[in-house]
From Swiss-Prot:
GO terms for biological process: carbohydrate metabolic process; pentose-phosphate shunt. GO terms for cellular component: cytoplasm. The gene is tal. It comes from Geobacillus thermodenitrificans (strain NG80-2). CDD domains: Transaldolase_FSA. This is Probable transaldolase.
Length: 213
């Protein structure tokens, strides 16, 4: 499973990139708004750091508007992926983008049927939202398993991005259940490194070494 980072913060992206684990970035209007910067300028900055997929979301709700926005976003850099909501109008736009060779990430996926529809429309990625499903008492991880099974049975090449990741357990379980990618907030990404026994082991090795000097 690959790691994307879910942020529009340049320092977070730079740090994750320096770690050598970053395969891409996902953004959304809310994340960009927090940064108080021009959307297009921030995308240019991100794509200058990251060579993998960078998801940029359209804000129009009709297919013609999404297509117009998406085509402009795609001009920013060749690794821009157009993020489109899981709606009938969104899938019309996905089909149009697919025919033009523009990559797409269908977001706000909450059912396997939605994921299948998005894949058949030509989506490069589908993004089921684990945390938001958990919030309403549904099993987001079970959804990952179901989508992965359906895609495997039918030879569908659309990749599954586990999104709305809340904690490290989501990452482990998404990997076990067949997600191709986890898009992870910076805070959770850093938590993946941590274990008290790792820290204790380092301290012991250093103490043992220093005693011999």
């Amino acid at each position: 499973m690959k790691f994307f980072i879910d942020t529009a913060n340049l320092e977070e992206i730079k740090h994750a990139h320096e770690l050598g684990i970053l395969a891409g970035v996902t953004t959304n209007p809310s994340l960009v708004a927090k940064e108080n910067v021009s959307f297009h300028d921030r995308l240019r900055e991100i794509t200058s750091i990251v060579s993998g997929s960078v998801s940029a979301e359209v804000i129009s709700t009709d297919a013609p508007g999404m297509i117009e926005e998406g085509e402009e976003l795609a001009k920013i850099a060749p690794n821009i992926t157009i993020k489109v909501p899981m709606t009938p109008e969104g899938l019309k736009a996905v089909k149009a983008f697919s025919e033009k060779g523009i990559k797409t990430n269908v977001t706000l996926v909450f059912t396997a049927n939605q994921a299948l529809l998005a894949a058949r429309a030509g989506a490069t990625y589908v993004s089921p939202f684990l945390g938001r499903l958990d919030d309403i008492g549904h099993n987001g991880l079970e959804l990952i398993s179901t989508i992965a099974d359906i895609f495997n049975i039918h030879g569908i090449e659309t990749e599954i991005i586990a999104a709305s990741i809340r904690h490290p357990h989501h990452v482990t379980e998404a990997a076990l259940r067949g997600a191709h990618i986890a898009t992870v907030p910076y805070k959770v990404l850093m938590q993946l490194f941590n274990h008290p026994l790792t820290d204790q082991g380092i301290e012991k090795f250093l103490a043992d070494w220093n005693r011999q000097q």
